[in-house]
Regions:
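Short hydrophobic alpha-helical runs that function as membrane-insertion/retention elements
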Residues: 41-44, 63-69
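Short Lys/Arg-enriched helix C-cap and helix-to-coil transition segments
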Residues: 374-390
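Active-site helix-to-loop segments that bind/position phosphate- or nucleotide-bearing substrates
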Residues: 1-18, 23-25, 33, 60, ...
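Residues in the recognition helix of alpha-helical DNA-binding motifs
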Residues: 369-370
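Extracellular/luminal Protease-associated
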Residues: 35-49
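Short, amphipathic alpha-helical "recognition" segments used to contact nucleic acids or chromatin
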Residues: 336-354
């Protein structure tokens, strides 16, 4: 994953002498044919233009173009021509029309989403105080026999999940006054009233664009999902498969909150809604990009999480088409890029001057780390220091 974010006013995208040229005020980016490093362009701007030739150039280079609304939600998108597979689509419709098949696929989606959500919560329990009582109890109540009861089951787990995430959000950024998502599982929170929901909306828009691109690549129909209901102008299959990777966005948002964002990093509109400033959006996209570009073991090899996304969508198509008899999504748990666990932080805070001398830890280093811990900030522990503390 390597998106290019264009944010602000006066953006012009055109083609000159076969080169794609992107202009914004005094900044000019130029790309030769077959030498553009980006796989998508995200436009979060208000005024600008793009030529027909530039749209052709991007399509020929398999670069998707996503246009975000003023509130950070995905407004529209251009994708390379979809894979045409009528037989696959017919079988996709047949699976949807068969209640048993539909419930099975929807159940597998929820099963993997719960696994990924729990993986994130358990990983965060090394750094934040997490109460597993409610969420573990709800997971054990996996009793459903139709889509409605399945959604109720998932909704109860989502409530417990967001309750724990809310604690982390408010510990990191108490001034942001986060309460929860408006609808915990199946919502499109179009207008954010607080910075954290604005970050989540923006991240989910990036995720939606990526999932849609790969559904397009495989040749499935985005308008026919299994967990989410069919509705005019909606893309239920996109929303279904988004559920499998929402945890990556949730983690990315917590990562950016750990950098100590301020209210000044956001814009308050005249309608009292919140949107991201350009630099904040770039920072969030960078976190999301890095997380999807991380490599994990998958089918006995190392793949980026983005490639694993594509392979899981391909697995769904193989099940739908009858090439495999059972469906199982396989998505790795997130790997947190921190080593200052609660245990380590408590150890550091317990070190007095005499203990410091005994451990041969630099005085200024210890003072700085203890100061950051008191302020609730993350710290980096080098292996040499970690060995001494443990």
């Amino acid at each position: 994953m390597n998106p290019l974010l264009l944010s602000g006013f006066g953006i012009t995208i055109e083609v000159n002498k076969a080169h794609l040229t992107i202009k914004q005020k005094d900044i000019v980016k130029e790309f030769e044919p077959h030498r553009i490093p980006y796989d998508s362009i995200i436009i979060d701007g208000h005024y600008g233009s793009i030529s027909f030739e530039a749209m052709r150039w991007l399509s020929k280079h398999n670069v998707s173009l996503s246009l975000l609304n003023w509130n950070g939600n995905l407004l529209s998108e251009t994708q390379p021509q979809e894979t045409l597979n009528a037989d696959l689509k017919i079988k996709q419709y047949e699976k949807y029309l068969d209640p048993e098949s539909r419930l099975y696929i929807a159940g597998q989606i929820v099963k993997q989403k719960v696994k990924s959500s729990m993986g994130l919560i358990r990983a965060f329990s090394e750094f934040y105080n997490i109460d597993f009582g409610t969420i573990d109890k709800e997971i054990q109540r996996a009793d459903y026999n139709n889509i409605s009861s399945l959604m109720m089951y998932e909704g109860r787990i989502a409530f417990a999940y967001w309750k724990e995430l809310s604690k982390i959000f408010n510990q990191l950024s108490p001034d942001f006054s986060f309460e929860t998502r408006k609808n915990l599982s199946y919502s499109w929170n179009m207008n954010a009233s607080d910075p954290i929901n604005a970050l989540l909306n923006y991240g989910y828009a990036i995720l939606e664009s990526t999932v849609r691109k790969y559904i397009n690549t495989i040749g499935l129909d985005t308008s026919i999902g299994y967990l989410h209901e069919i509705a005019p102008s909606k893309h239920p299959l996109v929303y279904d498969l988004q559920e499998l990777f929402r945890y990556v966005i949730d983690y990315s948002v917590i990562e950016i909150l750990e950098t100590r964002l301020k209210k000044s990093d956001f814009i308050l509109t005249e309608n009292y809604h919140i949107r991201l400033k350009p630099n904040t959006a770039k920072l969030l996209i960078e976190k999301i990009k890095n997380n999807f570009n991380k490599r994990y073991e998958f089918k006995n090899k190392q793949y980026t999480l983005e490639t694993i996304m594509l392979e899981n969508i391909r697995e769904l198509s193989r099940y739908v088409s009858g090439k495999i008899k059972t469906l199982e999504f396989r998505i790795p748990d997130i790997e947190i890029s921190r080593n200052d666990t609660i245990y380590i932080r408590n150890k550091i805070m317990s070190i007095d001057p005499e203990k410091r001398k005994e451990l041969k830890i630099n005085k200024s280093t210890l003072w700085y780390q203890q100061k950051k811990i008191k302020e609730g900030e993350t710290i980096k522990i080098y292996n040499k220091t970690k060995v001494k503390i443990e």
